């Protein structure tokens, strides 16, 4: 919102950084996303994935993009749809870790070896991604730091009579965490 302080995650950069790692060992990509009505997770992450794939002359076929709804069940069902239609996909990126865990469950139940046959990654560095086998490659967002920055901005707003002196927008960083679901690990 214009005129208001904002601390936010760089979802586009997160997807770019993750996809740059995945293209090193992937050829045919699938992507499980959420609605484009969600600016950050829906649009920004998908744009980041598409940018890197395009730069690497990899086509993300529209039939290989499935739209889910943030749940384990959705990841499971969308993986089922994707791999039933396109069993040659060797790399799956999901907009969230939760959907990636659901997708990984479907893959394992149906005899796919992760990462040998299909490498998979999500975003968010959730607890679930750390306990499934193989452990999920992901993007870590600095949520704790975001909270501390938000508190600082709030204190500055309370203590300052001039709102223009308070930094208005802070874009947080992120880092890719390569785990066993990526072929290089």
PLM feature spans:
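Alpha-helix N-cap/loop-to-helix initiation residues
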Residues: 38-39, 71-72, 100
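Flexible loop/turn connectors
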Residues: 3, 10, 14, 25, ...
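An alpha-beta-alpha
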Residues: 18-58, 63, 166-183
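Surface-exposed cleft-lining segments at the edges of enzyme active sites
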Residues: 4-6, 32
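Small/polar loops that bind or transfer phosphate-bearing groups
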Residues: 33, 41, 67, 95, ...
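Alpha-helical elements of Rossmann-like donor-binding domains used by nucleotide-donor carbohydrate transfer enzymes
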Residues: 17, 21, 44-51, 74-81, ...
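Alpha-helix N-cap and loop-to-helix initiation/capping positions
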Residues: 6-10, 41-44
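Short beta->alpha junction loops
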Residues: 64-73
């Amino acid at each position: 919102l214009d005129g208001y302080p904002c601390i936010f995650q760089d979802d586009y950069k997160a997807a770019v950084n993750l996809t740059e790692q995945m293209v090193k060992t992937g050829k045919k990509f699938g992507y499980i996303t959420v609605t484009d009505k969600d600016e950050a997770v829906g649009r920004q992450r998908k744009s980041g994935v598409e940018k890197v794939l395009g730069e690497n002359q990899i086509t993300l076929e529209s039939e290989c993009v499935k739209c889910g709804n943030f749940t384990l069940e959705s990841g499971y069902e969308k993986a089922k749809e994707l791999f039933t239609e396109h069993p040659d996909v060797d790399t799956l990126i999901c907009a969230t870790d939760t959907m990636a865990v659901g997708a990984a469950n479907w893959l394992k139940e149906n005899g796919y070896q992760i990462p040998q046959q299909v490498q998979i990654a999500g975003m968010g560095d959730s607890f679930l991604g750390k306990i499934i086998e193989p452990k999920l490659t992901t993007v870590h967002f600095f949520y704790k730091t975001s909270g501390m920055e938000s508190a600082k901005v709030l204190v500055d707003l309370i203590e300052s009579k001039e709102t223009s002196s308070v930094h208005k927008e802070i874009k947080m960083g992120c880092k890719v965490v390569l785990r066993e679901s990526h072929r290089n690990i």
